[in-house]
Amino acid sequence: MRSTRPMVNRRDFVARAVSTGAYLAFPHVAPPFEFAEATVAALQARMTAGTLTSRALVSAYFARMALIDRSGPALHSVIEQNPDALAIAASLDAERRRGRVRGPLHGIPILLKDNIDTGDRMATTAGSLALAGQSAPKDAYVVERLRAAGAVLIGKTNLSEWANFRSSRSTSGWSGRGGQTRNPYVLDRNPCGSSSGTAAAVAASLATIGVGTETDGSIICPSSLCGLVGIKPTVGLVSRSGIIPISVSQDTAGPMARTVTDAVVLLGAMTGVDPQDTATSASDGKSFPDYTTFCKVDALSGARIGVARNMAGFHPLVDAAFNGAIAAMRKGGATIVDPADVPTVGKYDDAEMDVLLYEFKDGLNAYLARRGVRTPVNTLEGLIAYNRANARREMPWFAQELFERAQAKGALTDERYRTALASCRKLARDDGVDAVMATHRLDAIVAPSNGPAWPTDHVNGDRFTGGNSSVAAVAGYPSITVPMGFAHELPLGLSFIGGAWTEPRLIGLAYAFEQLTRARRAPRFIPTVTEA
């Protein structure tokens, strides 16, 4: 019998769904993938058993990139594949057959943010067309460490161009070279940045694990918005040599992964004292080759957790998830100190920007000179001129006022710079994290990592509803974000913040919280949501 119900065409269905806040899942159905959500340990077990090779695994990830990164959902997260990855994987397979296994990363495919030097056939460009086609002469120290550990570098990831330090009106995840990276959870939402490509790619199982970098928020925010664990280490735990710089006082590389265990396996391989980065000398005796020993399910029991209420309150759905996370930690045996506010939050913002502008000019000019970048783009001044000459390709949406403000700064001997740096350290360290931790005898401070992902908007730029990376970033202290829930299909993260070199304690707390809540779920490549 023919139905008497009115026919609804596709356009009307979409309109009705949008009007009710429903999500629309039908346009992008990712094909089944054997290694979706696969952990480092699970892949190692298969390679040890002889049922999987590293070369086959790399091939599978490359095939998945073709299906969902360059077509289908078209995430645009990987800016370049390593043309030598299959050969490297085959060589590591041969080592395994001879009985040599370098460690837990042997044969594991990994992606790197495209501001980390690799002395191979891949370019290192910070997403800028100015450096397109230019390879670095040698590996960054952290890349040397990863290769030595047996990791297979399968590609470079897109990023917010110049790690989001070109314009205050930028759109996270966009670069002139790589275009716009999309959030795999809801495709019209932003992945945050600047480690946008690493976050989207790892979330979508385009690699097992990935490396990002952070000056302020560039690991924590994209990890939070893409449902990942992200670790922003103490400055000096991981070398910065061979990484395109913004700030010598705040920059660090860090792991991004789908689980705490995978993130800390990667962290252990990244640490080490590097003579080319004097900040790492302070890590001697404070780093560990195996951070998985701190992953204990009972780590919350007896811990004192401070709730930074003045770092919440920016979104009702985030607050609801945050309160649920606090309840879970209490259930796990933690003593909750609520509130344990950080009184200096936001008071260092102007000083931080001054510090970053000074340090960016000094650090970038030194980096470009050391790397031997071809003229005329071998100085900040030359890059500014290049962008002006190529504005249609490099500046279609936003300009370069941060570049120009940095170029106007003087040397790091300027009194204004030294005063700003001292102010940042006092406000974020002495009167900030250190004071709160000591006053309340805390093991960690917790806060929501960020608000929900916003719609990507190239005309108006990013629309952050809130974020809490700055206090740890300005202090140079560690922070770990762990999935804590969702706001209408959009992932939300919980940040654990501590004092210098407290990674072991934070890792334990983050792991126990992860195991207690199991809040992460894989992305479904939904085209849009209309709420949150």
Give the residues covered by each predicted segment.
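Structural helix-boundary/capping segments
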Residues: A148, V152, A203-R309, N323-G332, ...
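Glycine/threonine-rich flexible loop motifs
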Residues: A126, A132, H315-P316, W454-D462
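Gly/Ser-rich catalytic/binding loops embedded in alpha/beta enzyme cores
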Residues: Y23-F26, P31-D216, T234, R258, ...
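Flexible glycine/proline-enriched surface loops and loop-helix/loop-strand junctions
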Residues: T125-S128, R182-V186, S194, I244-T252, ...
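N-terminal secretory signal peptides and thylakoid transit peptides that target proteins
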Residues: R2-G21
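Short helix-loop capping/hinge segments that flank enzyme active sites or metal/cofactor-binding pockets
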Residues: G107-A126, T293-A308, L357-R429, D434, ...
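Short, surface-exposed loop/helix-turn segments at secondary-structure junctions
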Residues: H440, P452-S470
